[in-house]
């Protein structure tokens, strides 16, 4: 298994120099997050993830979760690691101080979540789902519900889930069958079965708080008739502690390709006592708070597993000796040269590096917007951040997982045949990553959300909010001595982006299938442009530090070289995505369903 080391240098480069989190924190009134405190948190977070979580990654995959008559036991060491995580204060790092949290910015919490996910993705899903449940209750719960649940969730005594999917419906939640019948005491009797519930049952906390989508008896049809309910595993008693067992049980756990140490459960609700959160029939709006949190978290999984894969691949490429360089021996005192000298191996490694570092920049850029949306005093500033988040969230989820899967595949390929062998650990990263483009809304659904709802649905407003940022950036740096060629390339694509969007929108007015046909290519096209913008932001800082004679010259040179690789070898993929978009829907829809197979 690759030995994980938190990429603190790259993290600090983004935090300190590219995005200047510290100035942002000061402007948002989050002065408690001082540079010294942030540095200490990063160091301690790295130690915990490297020394506690990473050693459990392979063993957790080998052992998996155990199911026995409704009881789920997590792999050896998981429960103890969670206790250490909670004791160290990590669980409430960015949570509201009113409920026992430390109140630090969301962006700092996201940096720690990257370390957690890279060191042990399966383990990280348990606290990750809880943070999502906390966000939904905090945003939509009554004061009584907040007082009852948030302190326990923040403290890590209780954990949370979200329960959406049923056997007959995943994407189409409007046809769920789970029902909630009003009771005389104001509660609801929730009945039905949910599947694919991550962390639905386990032994890591005293109680599990399920957020469940269900329909009231008189609910309107479709998604406008969905309500959200808090359904605890153990009902809180008068003292606020876990009391009587509720009528919710785990029927089984799934046997999966990857993330085997994360318990994926079938949950049965047999008249379980539930409590309405938010307004009746407005549950999907409430759940979207948690779903958007989960979608950003899922996008992070692409980055996290890609980082772990790159660390294994770069070490192997420097150690593995095979053949001689085409330009002559590079290690003449050895039997062969290390494979890192070969162009095709470098192609894979640089692709991994460019996507990982670009995706990290995208994640931190998005996290900084989360800070603004939550903390800014100015309403206009908050709304602008919310609009950008709405636009970026489906891109973060889908682009980062598509490229993350590509990165883990490259990592396994660098190892050759050894990558296919379990003991090296590279194939586990591929298996763990494969679910990321599927759950929390498939990437096809994310693409429809982006193009249909966010871009065309806003009449282009959300897209223009971002393209204006890029346009301003390009105008300011058009004459940059070393980078003006890349700036011009980005500027051209940014202008083309709007024109291409208009073309798709016009075609969709005549044929709605045009949106579905173009959506995924449109999302990937958008992702490549966004990463180009972020790579140039990193390159500008790196070049400025080189010009100033800063001590990190080698690191900055590497940044500039990787930026050049991205612009020359990866950004041109936009051309193929554009061609596919412009090809339209006819070639997809003309073949009758009965002729797909004979």
Question: What do these predicted regions represent?
Answer:
Residues 2-5, 89, 182, 259, ...:
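Alpha-helix capping/hinge segments and adjacent helical runs
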Residues 196-198, 235-251, 256, 263-294, ...:
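A glycine-rich, basic-preceded beta-loop-alpha segment at the flavin cofactor/substrate interface
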Residues 99, 111, 457, 473-598:
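C-terminal amphipathic alpha-helical interaction region
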């Amino acid at each position: 298994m690759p030995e994980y080391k938190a990429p603190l240098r790259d993290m600090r480069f983004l935090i300190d120099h590219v995005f200047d989190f510290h100035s942002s924190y000061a402007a948002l009134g989050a002065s408690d997050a001082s540079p010294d405190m942030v540095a200490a948190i990063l160091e301690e977070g790295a130690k915990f993830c490297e020394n506690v979580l990473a050693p459990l990654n392979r063993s957790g995959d080998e052992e998996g979760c155990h199911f026995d008559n409704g009881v789920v036991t997590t792999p050896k060491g998981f429960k103890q690691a969670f206790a250490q995580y909670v004791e160290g204060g990590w669980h409430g790092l960015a949570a509201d101080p009113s409920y026992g949290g430390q109140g630090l910015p969301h962006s700092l919490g996201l940096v720690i979540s990257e370390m957690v996910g890279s060191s042990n993705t399966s383990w990280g899903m348990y606290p990750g789902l809880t943070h999502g449940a906390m966000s939904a209750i905090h945003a939509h719960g009554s004061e009584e519900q907040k007082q009852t649940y948030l302190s326990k969730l923040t403290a890590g005594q209780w954990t949370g889930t979200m329960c959406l999917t049923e056997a007959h419906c995943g994407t189409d939640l409007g046809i769920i069958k789970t029902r909630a019948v009003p009771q005389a005491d104001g509660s609801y009797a929730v009945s039905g079965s949910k599947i694919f519930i991550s962390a639905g049952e386990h032994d890591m906390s005293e109680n599990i708080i399920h957020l469940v989508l269900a329909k009231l008896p008189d609910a309107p049809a479709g998604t406008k008739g969905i309500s959200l309910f808090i359904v605890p595993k153990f009902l809180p008693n008068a003292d606020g502690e876990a009391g009587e067992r509720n009528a919710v049980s785990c029927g089984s756990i799934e046997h999966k390709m990857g993330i085997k140490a994360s318990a994926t459960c079938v949950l049965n609700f047999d008249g379980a006592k539930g409590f309405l959160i938010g307004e009746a029939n407005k549950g999907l709006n409430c759940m979207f708070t948690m779903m958007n949190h989960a979608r950003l978290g899922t996008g992070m999984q692409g980055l996290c597993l890609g980082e772990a894969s790159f660390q294994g691949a770069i070490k192997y490429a420097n150690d593995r000796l095979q053949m001689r360089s085409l330009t002559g021996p590079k290690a003449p005192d050895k039997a062969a040269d290390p494979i890192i000298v070969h162009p095709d191996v470098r192609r894979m490694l640089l692709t991994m590096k460019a996507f990982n570092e670009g995706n990290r920049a995208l994640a931190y850029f998005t996290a900084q917007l989360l800070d603004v949306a939550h903390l800014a005093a100015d309403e206009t500033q908050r709304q602008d951040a919310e609009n950008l988040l709405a636009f970026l969230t489906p891109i973060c989820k889908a682009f980062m997982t598509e490229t993350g899967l590509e990165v883990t595949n490259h990592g396994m390929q660098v190892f050759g045949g050894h990558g296919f062998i379990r003991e090296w650990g590279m194939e586990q990263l591929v298996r763990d990553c494969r679910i990321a483009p599927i759950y929390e809304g498939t990437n096809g659904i994310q693409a429809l959300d982006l193009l249909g709802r966010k871009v065309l649905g806003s009449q282009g407003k959300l897209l223009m909010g971002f393209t204006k940022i890029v346009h301003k950036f390009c105008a300011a740096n058009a004459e940059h001595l070393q980078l003006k060629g890349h700036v011009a390339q980005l500027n051209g694509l940014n202008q083309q982006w709007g024109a291409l969007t208009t073309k798709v929108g016009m075609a969709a007015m005549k044929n709605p299938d045009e949106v579905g046909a173009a959506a995924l290519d449109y999302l990937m096209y958008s992702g490549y442009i966004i990463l180009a913008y972020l790579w140039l932001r990193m390159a500008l800082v790196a070049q400025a530090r080189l010009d100033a004679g800063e001590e990190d010259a080698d690191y900055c040179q590497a940044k500039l070289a990787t930026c050049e690789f991205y612009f020359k070898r990866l950004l041109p993929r936009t051309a193929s995505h554009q061609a596919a978009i412009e090809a339209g829907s006819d070639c997809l829809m003309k073949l009758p369903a009965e002729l797909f197979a004979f």
